[in-house]
Amino acid sequence: MVGLPTHTLSVLVEDTPGVLARVAALFSRRGFNIESLAVGATECKTMSRMTIVVSAEETPLEQVTKQLHKLINVIKVVEQEADNSLSRELALIKVRAEAGTRSQVIEAVHLFRARVIDVSLESLTVEATGDCSKIEALLRVLEPFGVREIVQSGVVSLSRGPRGIGTVR
C-alpha cells in the first residue's frame, strides 16, 4: 500500500511443517500484503527465522504481532528498526549485453559492487546484494541496456551489535 510505513519483523519459529502457512494466513486474514518474506535456518537446528516486510499503520500491526505470539510454534516476534538493524537482499539480474554495450554494463555492475556470475553472447547475469534502495538503483541503471529477467530474495535482517532475537521463550 502506498504511503504506509514499512515494518520489518523477525519471527523466530519452531521448524515444523505448517508454520509458514499459519503465519501467512494470519497476515492474509487481517488484510496485510506481505511485501517480502524470507525463511531460513538459525543457529539452533530446531528453529527457523522468518523475516517479514509489510506496510501498515502501527496499531493494526501491533494487533497482528500480538496474534502472532499466540500462534503455536511461534517463539518470538521482534520488529527490526532501521537504525538498529542490518537488512540485505539478493538479486540476480539478466541484462542484455551485446558486444557494443558489454563494457558499459560491466562498469555499471562494478560501480554497485555487484558481480557478473554468467556470460553469454547476448547477456550477462549479475549478482547484487544490498539494501532495497541499492538494488533498486542498480536496476534503474541497468534498465536502459534491457533487463531480461530478475529474481530477488526476500529481505533478511539482524539486529546490530550483541543483541539478538534469542532462542528461548
From Swiss-Prot:
Instruction: Identify the enzyme class.
Output: transferase
User: For this UniProt entry, which residues form the secretion signal?
Assistant: none
**What InterPro entries does the entry give?**
Acetalactate_synth_ssu (IPR004789), Acetolactate_synth/TF_NikR_C (IPR027271), Acetolactate_synth_ssu_C (IPR019455), ACT-like_dom_sf (IPR045865), ACT_dom (IPR002912), AHAS_ACT (IPR039557), AHAS_small-like_ACT (IPR054480)
- Single GO molecular function: acetolactate synthase regulator activity
Pathway field of the UniProt record reads: Amino-acid biosynthesis; L-isoleucine biosynthesis; L-isoleucine from 2-oxobutanoate: step 1/4; Amino-acid biosynthesis; L-valine biosynthesis; L-valine from pyruvate: step 1/4
Q: Quaternary state and partners of this protein?
A: Dimer of large and small chains.
Whichever gene encodes this chain, its name is: ilvH
Q: Which UniProt keywords apply?
A: Amino-acid biosynthesis, Branched-chain amino acid biosynthesis, Transferase
Q: What is its EC number?
A: 2.2.1.6
Reactions catalysed: 2 pyruvate + H(+) = (2S)-2-acetolactate + CO2
Q: Which NCBIfam families match?
A: acolac_sm (TIGR00119), PRK11895.1 (NF008864)
- Any Pfam family from its record, for instance, is ACT_AHAS_ss
GO biological process terms on file:
isoleucine biosynthetic process; L-valine biosynthetic process
Q: Which PANTHER family match?
A: ACETOLACTATE SYNTHASE SMALL SUBUNIT, ACETOLACTATE SYNTHASE SMALL SUBUNIT 1, CHLOROPLASTIC
Annotated family: Belongs to the acetolactate synthase small subunit family.
All copies of the ACT domain together span 8-85
Name by which UniProt lists this protein: Acetolactate synthase small subunit
Q: Name one GO cellular component term.
A: cytosol
